[in-house]
Amino acid sequence: MGQIFSRSASPIPRPPRGLAAHHWLNFLQAAYRLEPGPSSYDFHQLKKFLKIALETPARICPINYSLLASLLPKGYPGRVNEILHILIQTQAQIPSRPAPPPPSSPTHDPPDSDPQIPPPYVEPTAPQVLPVMHPHGAPPNHRPWQMKDLQAIKQEVSQAAPGSPQFMQTIRLAVQQFDPTAKDLQDLLQYLCSSLVASLHHQQLDSLISEAETRGITGYNPLAGPLRVQANNPQQQGLRREYQQLWLAAFAALPGSAKDPSWASILQGLEEPYHAFVERLNIALDNGLPEGTPKDPILRSLAYSNANKECQKLLQARGHTNSPLGDMLRACQTWTPKDKTKVLVVQPKKPPPNQPCFRCGKAGHWSRDCTQPRPPPGPCPLCQDPTHWKRDCPRLKPTIPEPEPEEDALLLDLPADIPHPKNLHRGGGLTSPPTLQQVLPNQDPASILPVIPLDPARRPVIKAQVDTQTSHPKTIEALLDTGADMTVLPIALFSSNTPLKNTSVLGAGGQTQDHFKLTSLPVLIRLPFRTTPIVLTSCLVDTKNNWAIIGRDALQQCQGVLYLPEAKRPPVILPIQAPAVLGLEHLPRPPQISQFPLNPERLQALQHLVRKALEAGHIEPYTGPGNNPVFPVKKANGTWRFIHDLRATNSLTIDLSSSSPGPPDLSSLPTTLAHLQTIDLRDAFFQIPLPKQFQPYFAFTVPQQCNYGPGTRYAWKVLPQGFKNSPTLFEMQLAHILQPIRQAFPQCTILQYMDDILLASPSHEDLLLLSEATMASLISHGLPVSENKTQQTPGTIKFLGQIISPNHLTYDAVPTVPIRSRWALPELQALLGEIQWVSKGTPTLRQPLHSLYCALQRHTDPRDQIYLNPSQVQSLVQLRQALSQNCRSRLVQTLPLLGAIMLTLTGTTTVVFQSKEQWPLVWLHAPLPHTSQCPWGQLLASAVLLLDKYTLQSYGLLCQTIHHNISTQTFNQFIQTSDHPSVPILLHHSHRFKNLGAQTGELWNTFLKTAAPLAPVKALMPVFTLSPVIINTAPCLFSDGSTSRAAYILWDKQILSQRSFPLPPPHKSAQRAELLGLLHGLSSARSWRCLNIFLDSKYLYHYLRTLALGTFQGRSSQAPFQALLPRLLSRKVVYLHHVRSHTNLPDPISRLNALTDALLITPVLQLSPAELHSFTHCGQTALTLQGATTTEASNILRSCHACRGGNPQHQMPRGHIRRGLLPNHIWQGDITHFKYKNTLYRLHVWVDTFSGAISATQKRKETSSEAISSLLQAIAHLGKPSYINTDNGPAYISQDFLNMCTSLAIRHTTHVPYNPTSSGLVERSNGILKTLLYKYFTDKPDLPMDNALSIALWTINHLNVLTNCHKTRWQLHHSPRLQPIPETRSLSNKQTHWYYFKLPGLNSRQWKGPQEALQEAAGAALIPVSASSAQWIPWRLLKRAACPRPVGGPADPKEKDLQHHG
């Protein structure tokens, strides 16, 4: 330790006396950054200067390096000036801390501490030090610790507690010198600190790393592992240094003081039970651990580190050194001291003392258990009242009103004191003025303190109220001075008995001894821009009564600095705050769209516009990434407009939901607000600042002419036009500015939409006051107002494209409708768009608009010419007449709102009006919904909801009465019989409904008083009447349909008419057939006025019921047929009944419905053997089972061109495989490839080895998930096997597949692929399957793969017959189970033979035996392999042997040594 890079070995220079160690560390790190490195002479001169500076009366804590630089004499030897310059540049990165709370009065002794209560926890003050600065010349590669290095570091920190300034100074220099990795730092922590400190440090470091990873670290890749792992790489210097800073910062947050707490020294006795030791630790932590500190990691760490040696060995042996506490207790519960028995020591609870409790004065309990609060230690130092603490003193809570600020006073309300340090990088909740960058051009705005703007016409003087605790509060004018370390107050504010001390002060006039005194009494200062008072523990007193200065000690509690704005700007201008959310917070890659070339005229205009924007401060030069093209557009008056194409940025931006529902309805402006004024903001978007991090998304390039040089890059500083979230952001900012004005003038109204503002007031005087306040607020926030566009009554008021008159509204521009039949599509589309804009004031129904909308449909080319029919031309005439009457009334607040809803075939028209008014308030049009049926009740309910929503949103009222054109009978029938969801809505609003009745023809003259030529609205009546009971005198009509045919039967005691007919092409559907059958039936029953209709189609049944209750025809594919139903059912009385089909009931309704269904049925003919073979390519035996003779089947096979070739599945020898003893005993699985039409299919095949039944599925991959899916489908098809046998492919040996087999209790084994002995069955099955697939695709090349595979499985499993048992695979798979043959049954008397044998599964070449077979069967023999067990041996491992002759007996010449194979 003590070694510095590029320097000889020398001890670390010691700090001068009186300077804190962490401040000295800052000076050392700044000195080590000098190039070349510092010398001993530099350190000597630095210590000499600091010693002189520490002796000055003005203390430098918190230290101010700028003040030190000002005290440095010119020509001072050494490089002290360079060191201070480095510190001044680095100090801006460290946030200052608030002043400590005022200490209690020293005149009173602290209360006696209670021995039963642990001392309170005091959190150490974190040292204020600069970040680790790696000096120049540091080695590029990291050097790991050596043991001598660790010993040297430990020797220097042996007398310092972890987190103390001396400890942090040594550790920081060690980190600076060795540049350690994360593992090196962990080794250093374990070597230096106890396990408790290491555990707490590890926990704090984890939380810091989590915050840093969330915030984002340069060079950190989340996919490469956690930060600890990446910081271990010596090549990752950036990440390593980030980890070093976090590791050092974790020491500053360690709980506890410099000494170890009392509970850290609790050790387990040599004979103490482990559970008693843990209990003592738990109680000590509960009493002494600071609040908020987690107890569990500390308890686990101490439970191991402070245990005795024997318990530590037990915990190490079981691996429970840092396990949960329960595991540690179980590991040590059986431990007892050597040569001693287990003793349970029970300590009795100590009785409470006889003395009374000092809190409540009562005896019988401990003071720590008392519920009363702790009494104050003595009289309050502020008011000398002994009944409360100083923190509860009423003098700290001002009761007198605060002084009113003057017009030019400060406007900011700084935050109050808080017990924890604030993060000043965010400005303490304040907003900086726009000229802050001009005042401090070299500072980063994120690191500047909040500012206090002052009046440039006056000195920085403010009014303050001072309370010296010895006299009444007084108001004085004080000078704000950031150069004064302490606040100075005149002696006139203090009483004569105030204790004052002599002091010397060094100021601008030199040093003085008797001018100022020092007082230690707390002083309360109330400032106009602060809601809570400032408490100063001491201040200077001017004995000559000349000065009142607010110094840095007071301003530091305000967390602000002074700022004097330029003389050009008003003194109280505050900018609009930058938006908190822009829609680009996810920071995608900025767009890089190349700038397209411009002609010389446009390029010159663009350069002129850019120069004007640069002078206005809207843009600035830029060199970063991102680009969007720009171009100028020439306006009608000859000037140019700057256009920035931000479509690429808009595509990356998240839409912000706007709180504005749209432009306000000006008809809601009451007639009582007759005095109006408009305010138009100029370049409103250019007043919202744009954060720096979003500039790449709004950058552009101005090219040079003919590409003579690189273009000039710029980026927006403010919110540009063309950004899709700009209107929403500006609306939110403007609404925030206008909200105080709205609250100050409740009798007036302010309408705001985008950058247009309308002021409405009941009197001219109120309008002037409202206008003045609004203008002042807008100007104070930097929003320029266009004076030439301001309008005021009396006079014409044009706002949002409308002209506001005293009692009505008109549109500024009403379109002119030319009457002609030929239109270009863009012309008609533009005309209808203009008509739609003024439709709220146009007295017309929906029909003329719908007629012209239909003319725009079915056109795909924008250049098409549209030819209108006579009815559409007539619609143009009606619209021109209606536009001539375009006018709307303004709201009369004394009259109720009325509504009229007219339902027509083309849509709904809703009118909101007031009685006795010449014009309505608004006309609303809505098209029919996109459904096949539009019930009148549903349309009425939707119109009512739309009407209520609009009137509440625009007028704040509901319509008192709603007129509609549905007849009363139809309306009541819909309410009583319909189950539509709109019925509850209509019932809820039924008290407001009123039927127009006979007044429909006179609607316009009776209610609206309009002269517009509008057609009368007819009352709506249903097409036919629905009878609730069956009609005895009417015939019965049955109809039905299928996808290909339709039929009906007309019956009246006998079948009068019946017919079945096919559907006409090209569209064929069951609904179309059912509708067509009903239409033919109605056509045949046209002569009857009454009719009973029986339908088994729910679609037609509900359609007819809705038609009977009243409906309009909507959009449907069956619209031409549905339009015929009203004509055929007109004025009929119909009984409608739904029939359930295929019930086979004996009643006549079911019988006639079944007879109708029979007319649709086409008989199904069985396939002939030749057709069956052409479809499936099944075998000869399958054809004979389907009725063909053997000769016919043979001829069919010979005539099939696909079956004449050889089958590839027979090319593999049959071999011998292990087969199952019953179905679903053993399966074999494999994946085979089948390529067709450039698509490679993976066929997952499973074969039952007993029956040969196959299950196959086609997949596109060979993954484990596909293999699992195919096995599950096979189990659903064939059943669950006991064993499965596959090859060792990756899909079958994966962990997922094995886990699935284990969960299903299936045993999985593997075999050698392409081996006739082990995998022959599944390989042959693959060949059979692919042969059939090739045949199918040869016959039908377009056959889907799923269909071909299904036909092949049907053919193999259900049609083809096995030659050995004359059954199909499916029959064999589902055949009855045979009784198992036990191996222990009595042996037969059949003659057995002697065999040599080899045991299965062994590779031995030596034959064993001979042994006499106990039993022989097909394929194996039961051989006694030992004295106590026998085993079935297959024939391939047996060799026939002669019977051994008895001892001494002759050999039998007939016996031969034979070898058998199965």
From Swiss-Prot:
Binding-site list for Mg(2+) 2: D1040, E1074, D1096, D1157
Cofactor annotation: Mg(2+)
Sites annotated Cleavage: L130, P131, L344, V345, L449, P450, L574, P575, L582, G583, M1021, P1022, L1167, S1168
Biological process per Gene Ontology, one example term: symbiont-mediated suppression of host gene expression
Ranges where the Reverse transcriptase domain occurs: 614-804
The reaction(s) this protein catalyses: Endonucleolytic cleavage to 5'-phosphomonoester; DNA(n) + a 2'-deoxyribonucleoside 5'-triphosphate = DNA(n+1) + diphosphate
Binding site for Mg(2+) 1: D680, D755, D756
Residue ranges of the region described as Disordered: 93-144
Span(s) of short sequence motif PPXY motif: 118-121
GO MF assignments: aspartic-type endopeptidase activity; DNA binding; DNA-directed DNA polymerase activity; RNA stem-loop binding; RNA-directed DNA polymerase activity; RNA-DNA hybrid ribonuclease activity; structural molecule activity; zinc ion binding
Location of the DNA-binding region in this protein: 1393-1443
Pfam families: Gag_p19, Gag_p24, Gag_p24_C, IN_DBD_C, Integrase_Zn, RNase_H, rve, RVP
Residues bearing PTM Phosphoserine: S105
Record keywords, A-Z: Aspartyl protease, Capsid protein, DNA integration, DNA recombination, DNA-binding, DNA-directed DNA polymerase, Endonuclease, Eukaryotic host gene expression shutoff by virus, Eukaryotic host translation shutoff by virus, Host gene expression shutoff by virus, Host-virus interaction, Hydrolase, Lipoprotein, Magnesium, Metal-binding, Multifunctional enzyme, Myristate, Nuclease, Nucleotidyltransferase, Phosphoprotein, Protease, Repeat, RNA-binding, RNA-directed DNA polymerase, Transferase, Viral genome integration, Viral nucleoprotein, Virion, Virus entry into host cell, Zinc, Zinc-finger
Domain Integrase catalytic: 1219-1388
UniProt-annotated catalytic positions: D481
Binding site for Mg(2+) 3: D1230, D1287
Chain ranges for the short sequence motif PTAP/PSAP motif as given in the UniProt record: 124-127
Keyword Secreted: no
ZnF locations on chain (CCHC-type): 355-372, 378-395
N-myristoyl glycine lipid attachment residues: G2
Enzyme Commission number(s) of this protein: 3.4.23.-, 2.7.7.49, 2.7.7.7, 3.1.26.4
Impact when changing A508I: Decrease in protease activity
InterPro entries: Aspartic_peptidase_AS (IPR001969), D_retro_matrix (IPR003139), DNA/RNA_pol_sf (IPR043502), Gag_p24_C (IPR045345), Integrase_C_dom_sf_retrovir (IPR036862), Integrase_C_retrovir (IPR001037), Integrase_cat-core (IPR001584), Integrase_Zn-bd_dom_N (IPR003308)
GO cellular component: viral nucleocapsid
Protein's UniProt name: Gag-Pro-Pol polyprotein
Organism: Human T-cell leukemia virus 1 (strain Japan ATK-1 subtype A)
Taxonomic lineage of the native organism: Viruses, Riboviria, Pararnavirae, Artverviricota, Revtraviricetes
Gene designation: gag-pro-pol
